[in-house]
């Protein structure tokens, strides 16, 4: 049979996204859609302007990232180079309770605009991101040349479409802006029944505008302060539209000051809460970046770790048995802090870095004994969440020096340096910074020895938990943070670690998780599969070479092995380079 097509991808191993075994064949594309997929090429080349010989490569549906914050930066990085060049053709934005709307006279657009917020309202410990719209826009005009004028999710979607984007964007509504727009700064309490009713109006409007669900971030303000009844009430509105309730469950507790003697919540209770929202609201649930939620002591005991993971997954399975559609997502590489890598060691002392104004100046100041003692007093008080030995007593064991002008420190943890010198770990940290304020570190990682059990669960999916950016992104006030490695190579790490090297999943099962399983979860029709009539979101990948090139020292490197990427039939990545094409769409609720 002859097919009129624009693009022909031939001789590849077709991995169609359904879980079926790969086979050698071809894919033909006309305009936005796939017109043929088959074992025999035949006359598919008729009219094809682009012919790709995929001999020795896998041809898969485009990858769908189900846990992402790309909506907060897509207007600033519309090509989303970091996503497309690792094969992400569709991202689900609006996670962890944050979305770009609704807002009225105050706006909050997340930590992707950290420099702007810091200029407007300098902070020492915790940034203020809910600010007056006029003041925000004055600074925004100065930095970017345009203003933020949208107020609703519908308006924001139109803004994104008007500017164009390379990937597809699946919008979720965040719980944070709903609470902000109704309660403003008076959010550290349960909402009144009248306030909940007002929130429901905003939820309904967002769902009518095309959102595919609502997210909450229970470890962050203002979601942290919501009652269970509020969550159920809002999720019930989302359920009316067939939407998804995505939940960063309560695990750490509020990520702000934690005084000595104040204990974090029992992590598993946060998962139970999310699943119970699903039961009460009769809604599909997505658990964000799930991990083992039972603490194991001593660490490293494989049998105990497996038992804890089984107990965590049993809660998921029990909810599924009760009729709740439950999925969960995993971050491929868990080094760093979600959206950022913070590989300058000095970032551990960020409040004092801000005061000093530069890494060099803080390095000099740390030579003062009195200054050190003041810093240690604050740290031990629990005022600074990100370095709090009261809640993370093993922090020094997990911080390894990877680069320093002082060779004696390289490839040692802060704990090892402290032991060698017979000093407190905090003093060891400061000694390393004094020796080289530009010293680089890499987290030892939090990769669970039982993560394979999560990958093998049929409800698991993948999300890189990062912003849509390119290699130019860095904070400037002062420079202390860089993007996460996952911003550039998370999916490449997934296929290397889970398929080629780890052999945890077969290629077809690994592909299914990030394509048809993810599409089904969020109701993406004709996405996530290679079949006639489906949208032409396609990745051509060399499974023998696919791997991240990003490292803790240099996270801003694109991966190897992702050769070609198509979005809605547009050739966005060609020979591993972004073409500049912007064929992406906002995938509204249908």
Language model: regions and residue ranges:
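Acidic, glycine-enriched loop/beta-strand segments at the rims
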Residues: 14-26, 440-451, 502-511, 519-556
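Histidine-rich, glycine-flanked metal-binding segment
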Residues: 2-8, 14-62, 77, 548
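Divalent metal-binding pocket/active-site signature
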Residues: 208-270
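Divalent metal-coordination and catalytic microenvironments
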Residues: 12, 27, 32, 56, ...
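Divalent-metal coordination cores built from histidine and acidic residues
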Residues: 57, 76-212, 242-243, 324
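Active-site neighborhoods of metal-dependent hydrolases
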Residues: 156-160, 165-185, 190-193, 199-221, ...
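C-terminal cap of metal-dependent C-N hydrolases
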Residues: 12, 368, 453-459, 464-472, ...
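Metallo-beta-lactamase
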Residues: 62-71
């Amino acid at each position: 049979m002859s097919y009129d097509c624009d693009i022909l991808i031939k001789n590849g191993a077709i991995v169609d996204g359904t879980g079926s075994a790969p086979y050698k064949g071809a894919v033909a594309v006309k305009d936005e859609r796939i017109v043929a997929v088959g074992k025999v090429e035949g006359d598919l080349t008729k009219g094809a302007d682009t012919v790709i010989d995929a001999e020795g490569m896998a041809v898969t549906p485009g990858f769908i990232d189900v846990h992402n914050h790309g909506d907060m930066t897509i207007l600033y990085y519309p090509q989303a180079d970091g996503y497309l060049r690792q094969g992400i053709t569709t991202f689900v934005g609006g996670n962890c309770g944050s979305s770009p709307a609704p807002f009225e006279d105050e706006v909050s657009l997340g930590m992707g605009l950290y420099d702007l917020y810091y200029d407007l309202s300098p902070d020492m410990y915790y940034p203020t991101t809910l600010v007056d719209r006029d003041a925000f826009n004055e600074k925004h005009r100065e930095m970017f040349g345009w203003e933020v004028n949208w107020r609703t999710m519908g308006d924001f979607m139109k803004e994104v479409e008007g500017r164009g984007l390379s990937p597809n964007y699946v919008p979720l509504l965040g719980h944070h802006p709903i609470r902000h727009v109704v309660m403003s700064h008076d959010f550290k309490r349960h909402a009144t029944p009248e306030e909940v009713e007002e929130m429901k109006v905003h939820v309904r409007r967002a769902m009518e505008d095309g959102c595919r669900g609502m997210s909450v971030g229970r470890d962050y303000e203002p979601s942290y302060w919501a009652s269970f009844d509020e969550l159920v009430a809002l999720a019930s509105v989302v359920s009316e539209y067939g939407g998804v309730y995505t939940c960063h469950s309560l695990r750490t507790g509020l990520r702000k000051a934690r005084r000595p003697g104040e204990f974090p919540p029992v992590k598993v209770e946060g998962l139970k809460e999310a699943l119970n929202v699903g039961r009460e609201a009769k809604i599909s649930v997505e658990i964000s970046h799930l991990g083992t939620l039972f603490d194991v002591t001593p660490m490293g005991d494989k049998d105990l770790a497996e038992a804890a993971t089984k107990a965590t997954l049993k809660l998921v399975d029990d909810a599924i048995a009760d009729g709740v559609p439950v999925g969960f997502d995993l971050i491929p590489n868990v080094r760093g802090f979600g959206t950022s890598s913070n590989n300058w060691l000095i970032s551990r002392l960020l409040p004092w870095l801000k005061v000093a104004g530069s890494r060099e100046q803080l390095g000099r100041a740390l030579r003062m004994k009195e200054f050190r003692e003041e810093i240690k007093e604050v740290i031990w008080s629990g005022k600074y969440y990100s370095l709090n030995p009261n809640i993370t007593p093993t922090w020094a064991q997990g911080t390894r020096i990877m680069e320093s002008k002082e060779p004696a420190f390289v490839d040692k943890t802060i704990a090892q340096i402290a032991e060698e010198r017979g000093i407190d770990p905090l003093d060891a940290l400061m000694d390393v910074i004094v020796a080289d304020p530009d010293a680089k570190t890499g987290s030892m990682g939090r990769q669970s020895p039982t993560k394979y059990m999560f990958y093998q669960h049929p409800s698991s999916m993948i999300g890189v938990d990062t912003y849509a950016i390119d290699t130019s992104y860095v904070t400037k006030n002062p420079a202390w943070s860089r993007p996460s490695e996952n911003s550039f190579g998370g999916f490449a790490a997934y296929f290397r670690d889970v398929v080629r090297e780890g052999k945890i999943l077969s290629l077809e099962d690994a592909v299914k998780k990030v394509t048809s399983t993810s599409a089904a979860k969020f109701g993406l029709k004709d996405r996530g599969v290679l079949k006639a009539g489906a949208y032409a979101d396609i990745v051509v990948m060399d499974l023998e070479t696919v791997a991240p090139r990003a490292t803790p020292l240099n996270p801003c490197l694109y991966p190897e092995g992702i050769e070609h990427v198509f979005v809605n039939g547009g050739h966005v990545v060609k020979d591993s380079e972004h073409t500049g094409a912007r064929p992406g769409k906002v995938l509204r609720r249908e």
